[in-house]
Regions:
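Asparagine-centered strand-capping/turn motif at beta-strand->loop junctions
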Residues: 530-537
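C-terminal PAP-associated
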Residues: 2-501
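Short flexible loop/turn segments that cap and initiate beta-strands
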Residues: 538-545
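Conserved aromatic beta-strand anchor motif in extracellular beta-sandwich/beta-rich domains
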Residues: 546-552
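Short, solvent-exposed loop/turn segments enriched in Ser/Thr/Gly
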Residues: 520-527
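Intrinsically disordered, low-complexity Pro/Gly/Ser/Thr-rich segments with frequent PxxP/GP/PP motifs
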Residues: 557-565
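Low-complexity, acidic Ser/Thr/Pro/Gly-rich terminal tails and inter-domain linkers that flank the onset
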Residues: 500-520
């Protein structure tokens, strides 16, 4: 049974876009790098009997391997139409000044949300805002936008947009002091508030959900249903060795969040299952999953909107190898070793509940790989268990987003062996081959030039439906360029989908001038018939340009006019 707590109305803060971010001092960079070691903390290890069961398929995998990722099409503005089923990138950009080198990390943890042309993306130590649909980004300082609390800001940010209430959520983790820590939930209501940096925020602590002093939240994430926002987190002791004690999910009503008033939070806390991963795509019921620590099962939780009752079903899955993952690349640097088998991606759509997680090498799999379980929403029976694997490289760190059709796609990394860490995108929709019988449909995005010198990567990526074109997706990722240090990590923003769902089809206009006479007064009216080609809906703060030219004798005269809608 869930419990409830009331917290005060939110505070307000004003952020600024910074074309030149302040440089972090060496001491501050060292503090942040050390702080990363305190996040993504592991839970209890599985029982020996569970580990021993991983020999289940030593004769080899029973599902086909996925080949090398295909090369996607990057759609240029105004380009000729492509076949409707063509996978395309509408945006695929480096964050540039939005993620300066002093603020990036090989443990990238990028998250993203968008409200029309305003795109907000975060990583471990940075935040970035685009007001031109992700073409360019400016830096937002997460250290100074809000007042500091507890041990100061670091790491584990999550971003999510709710189109129904026009709210963009920005969840930030503050490190613990001697007593507790804080998850700060900042909200920008409307595109203009997001673009101008106008935020209000609530602070969440472990003590608000009935936990004692000396506990702190780690690894927080966000998801939505029709009428609620959900925050999940793992709870650890502040004192070393940072032992796991609880896992929590909090339910926050969207109407109250929109009204920015005092807030009633419903919450559910457990001490027998580590790490909750809640489903993207939920409507009137949220689901979340957690791996059993003693058997080959996923505990499938469910919580109906408006109900205080949390219930669950234990779903048996196939065993999988769960030793320490390893996937050294050409330079011997191993980017897989920080990962574990907590569930990373979860979705519900079209009567199917799905979960995705990392598994290690072993039991016939030469490299770490991604496990998937699809469950019938009505019967809670397993439908199938696809595997994303290869005999040449590891596949790791999947994220999943659900589009308006209930189809899934998201970023995922590959690499190891002769390949450096590579960012890819997978898609599984009505046009994809069945991964169970034919392997996964994947597309390469960018390949690193090096492996991480610290032998770290992750800890998660993000995928969301694009707003307002919910049949396409936005997603995050990164690569290493020119070296293996934190400063070489380059985050990316991606907007992708099928050509049939391209919200920016070739558009423009043709102009036909009618006959006219140049008057002696020097003022001439030229009747012009404008015929539109394609269509485009302009949202708030959109920018468009009208240009035309004519000849005055042999001199070409140009005019360009720009307008912000």
């Amino acid at each position: 049974m869930a419990e409830s707590v009331v917290i005060d109305k939110p505070s307000r803060a004003q952020g600024d876009l910074l074309p030149q971010p302040p440089q972090l001092s060496p001491e501050e960079q060292q503090r942040l790098e050390q702080a990363v070691e305190r996040t993504h903390l592991p839970g209890p290890r599985p029982s020996p009997s569970r580990d021993a069961a991983a020999i289940f398929d030593a004769v080899g995998p029973s599902v086909p391997a996925t080949g090398e990722a295909a090369s996607p099409v990057e759609k240029a503005m105004g380009a000729a139409p492509l076949a409707p089923g063509t996978f395309t990138f509408l945006q695929n950009v480096d964050l540039g000044a939005g993620a300066p080198s002093g603020y990036t990390s090989v443990v990238g943890e990028p998250s993203v949300g968008n409200n029309g042309t305003a795109v907000f993306q975060t990583g471990n130590w940075y935040a970035a805002l685009s007001t031109d649909a992700g073409q360019t980004f400016s830096f937002v300082n997460p250290f100074t936008t809000f007042p500091s609390v507890n041990g100061g800001f670091c790491c584990d940010q999550s971003v999510l947009y709710d189109q129904s209430r026009d709210l963009l959520f920005w969840l930030m983790l503050y490190l613990p002091d001697d007593n507790t820590n804080t998850l700060r939930l900042a909200i920008a209501k409307g595109q203009s508030a997001l673009s101008s940096g106008s935020w209000y925020y609530y602070d969440l602590t472990p003590q608000m959900v009935g936990l004692p002093t000396g506990r702190w939240f780690d690894y927080p994430h966000l998801t939505l249903s029709n009428n609620y926002l959900y925050v999940t987190a793992n709870v650890f002791t502040i004192s070393q060795p940072y032992s796991w004690t609880n896992t929590v999910i909090m339910r926050l009503p969207l109407d109250t969040l929109s009204a920015h008033t005092a807030l009633t939070i419903d919450y559910y806390v457990t001490n027998d299952h580590f790490n909750f991963t809640a489903t993207q795509g939920a409507t009137t019921r949220i689901y979340w999953g957690s791996q059993s620590l003693t058997s080959w099962q996923i505990r499938l939780y469910q919580w109906d909107e408006g109900s205080p009752t949390v219930s669950w079903t234990d779903v048996t899955i196939s065993p999988y190898p769960s030793s320490t993952p390893s996937c050294p690349g050409p330079d011997g640097r191993d980017w897989c070793g920080r990962s574990d088998d907590r569930i990373l991606g979860a979705w519900v759509a079209n009567g199917i509940i799905g979960f995705m997680w990392n598994a290690s090498q072993g039991s016939g799999y030469p490299y770490p790989h991604v496990r998937v379980a699809r469950i019938n929403e009505s019967t809670k029976a397993v439908i199938d268990q696809p595997v994303l694997w290869s005999s040449q490289v590891a596949w790791m760190y999947p994220a999943v987003g659900v589009n308006g059709r209930g189809h899934i796609a998201g970023p995922v990394f590959s690499g190891g062996g002769t390949s450096y860490p590579t960012l890819n995108v997978f898609i599984w929709d009505d046009l994809s081959p069945d991964p169970v019988t034919s392997g996964w449909e994947t597309y390469g995005v960018v390949t690193s030039t090096n492996g991480p010198t610290s032998n770290k990567w992750g800890d998660y990526l993000a995928a969301r439906p694009q707003s307002p074109n919910s049949n396409t997706w936005i997603g995050t990722g990164y690569s290493l360029q020119g070296g293996g240090a934190n400063s070489n990590a380059r985050p990316r923003f991606m907007w992708f989908g099928r050509e049939r769902d391209n919200s920016s089809p070739p558009y423009g206009a043709t102009y036909q001038a009618a006959g006219f006479t140049i008057g002696a007064s020097g003022v001439t009216t030229v009747p012009v018939t404008v015929t539109n080609t394609g269509s485009l809906t302009w949202g708030a703060n959109s920018v468009f340009r009208l240009s035309y030219h004519w000849y005055q004798g042999n001199t070409l005269i140009d005019f360009n006019g720009q307008r912000t809608n």
